[in-house]
Amino acid sequence: MQPYEKYLKLNSQKLRADQTDTERKLWQRINRDQLLGFRFNRQKPLLSYIVDFYCAKTKLIIELDGSQHYKPDYQEKDALRDAELNSLGFTVMRFSNDEVMREIEAVVEQIYLFLENVRTD
């Protein structure tokens, strides 16, 4: 189990209860071990963050980015966060909300290919 800041637990529970349409759409495709038997958690506290989706077995983090993530200050924060997580052995995959809503098959395919590669290593 990965460590996390305890104060994040309540926030993550609220986020799970109020998931966005985009999060719901992807969750329907990756929950219940649907992708090669890998289990995902949603709105998972991890270190000092809450990540959208997390697969502990592969240390894969999936983030869904709304329009606010394309503003310079958010891009900088996301880059620092991703760099910290990558330095600790996590892989971060980012998809825009538009990608998930319009091209869900392509998004799931990218996740599947990553998991397949990890599984064969």
From Swiss-Prot:
Family annotation (PANTHER family): BLL0828 PROTEIN (PTHR38590:SF1)
Protein name, UniProt field: Uncharacterized protein HI_0925
Family to which the UniProt record says this protein belongs: To E.coli YcjD and H.influenzae HI_1162.
